[in-house]
């Protein structure tokens, strides 16, 4: 009984000491809540969006890579390339490369000039594709897919940056098109025009979709680009690189034998338009963890200084408590209890806010910063904002020509 009576005064001192220095503890509490909440939200948002990126590879039929030929390939050349076999001359040794069979898909486009403000001046380059249900599908973010030769769907991120909206009329190489919808292509998570670009440009570069008739209205030369999917999916990045090297040798040999030329070759792993966003989120997640560690060390230092000052100010009271029979361990636990309580409460509140509020903030930042749309962020946005929005998003994609969710 006597032991309990001795402990009670220390326990009663805790709320009094917190109230006495409430401004100091409030600042530390808010700092911890914001730090833990933001980092927690970043982890939740990044994990959900990276998961959506992985699922989007199959759902939206993302390419394993693409190459461009000088001239359109005939059916015989397409079949030869799909075989994955190296074409060798009769007097040459067989290649050491493994046979890498693939499936090829036409993914032709035209690079046209874009005038989105109807001032008669070139505002940028717009890469125009036709609607397809086979490879590199697009997700409808707003509006509808083009239904006739006068309609066009443009990239959501580009539209947001230049103030373009559904229903606007733009000029593509002098031809007028009505913006029917805003889309997000699975192979353009960011708007990199070239694979050598260090940074994407969502203002001067745009990707768009038109009907076949709309494509025929345009005049610029066609880029004969073929996307491929491996018959046997690589298990990891290392195998993907090996398959890509083997396929490159086979493809080039077949193209040269047919008298054609290879203009470009871009496997998926080296395509910044596909990988930049996920790489960026992965680095942000790691940076968030390091930032949290640094801030926790800073907070620990602040608490150490605070406790030291408190002990110095209450040295006489501590002497009285020691004379009353309190051990050093009991006094240490008492003066540590206030920082521990503040840190624990801040961690609880911070994680609650991280899972409910800050994850939406982080998703919104990526949504604005990069062309994530629903094609990439659909699952991430749904995980971060609830199943109700996911159902609404699925409803818009299910009737699309290019999203083709109904076919998946």
Over which residues does each language-model region extend?
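Short, intrinsically disordered low-complexity segments enriched in Ser/Thr with adjacent Pro
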Residues: 380-389
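Membrane transport/envelope proteins' first extracytoplasmic loop
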Residues: 2-300, 309, 328-329, 364, ...
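Interfacial "coupling" helices/loops that link adjacent transmembrane helices in transporter permeases
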Residues: 13, 19-21, 301-340
């Amino acid at each position: 009984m006597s032991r309990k009576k001795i402990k009670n005064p220390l326990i009663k001192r805790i709320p009094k000491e917190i109230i006495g220095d409430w401004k100091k503890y409030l600042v530390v509490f808010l700092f911890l809540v914001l730090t833990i909440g933001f980092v927690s939200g970043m982890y939740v948002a990044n994990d959900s969006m990276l998961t959506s990126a992985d699922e989007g590879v199959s759902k939206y039929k993302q390419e394993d890579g693409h190459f461009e030929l000088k001239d359109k390939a005939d059916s015989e050349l397409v079949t030869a390339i799909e075989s994955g076999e190296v074409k060798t001359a009769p007097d040459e040794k067989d290649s050491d490369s493994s046979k890498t069979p693939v499936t090829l898909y036409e993914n032709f486009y035209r690079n046209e000039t874009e005038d989105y403000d109807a001032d008669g001046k070139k505002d940028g380059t717009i890469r125009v594709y036709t609607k397809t249900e086979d490879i590199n599908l697009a997700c409808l973010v707003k509006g509808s897919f083009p239904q006739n030769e006068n309609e066009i769907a443009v990239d959501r991120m580009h539209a947001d940056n230049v103030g373009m909206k559904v229903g606007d009329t733009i000029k593509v190489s002098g031809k007028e098109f009505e913006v029917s919808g805003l889309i997000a292509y699975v192979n353009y998570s960011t708007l990199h025009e070239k694979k050598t670009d260090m940074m994407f440009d969502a203002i001067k570069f745009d990707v768009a979709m038109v009907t076949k008739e709309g494509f025929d209205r345009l005049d610029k030369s066609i880029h004969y680009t073929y996307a491929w999917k491996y018959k046997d999916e690589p298990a990891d990045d290392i195998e993907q690189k090996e398959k890509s090297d083997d396929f490159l040798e086979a493809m080039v040999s077949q193209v040269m034998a047919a008298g054609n030329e290879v203009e470009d070759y871009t496997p998926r792993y080296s395509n910044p338009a596909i990988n930049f966003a996920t790489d960026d989120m992965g680095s942000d997640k790691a940076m968030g963890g390091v930032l949290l560690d640094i801030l926790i060390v800073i907070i620990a230092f602040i608490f150490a200084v605070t406790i030291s000052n408190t002990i110095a100010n209450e040295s006489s009271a501590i002497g009285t408590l020691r004379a009353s029979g309190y051990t050093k361990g009991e006094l240490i636990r008492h003066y540590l209890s206030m920082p521990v309580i503040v840190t624990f409460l801040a961690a609880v509140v911070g994680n609650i806010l991280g899972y409910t509020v800050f994850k939406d903030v982080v998703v919104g930042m990526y949504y604005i910063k990069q062309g994530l749309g629903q094609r990439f962020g659909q699952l991430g946005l749904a995980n971060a904002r609830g199943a109700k929005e996911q159902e609404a998003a699925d409803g818009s994609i299910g009737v699309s020509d290019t999203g083709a969710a109904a076919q998946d």
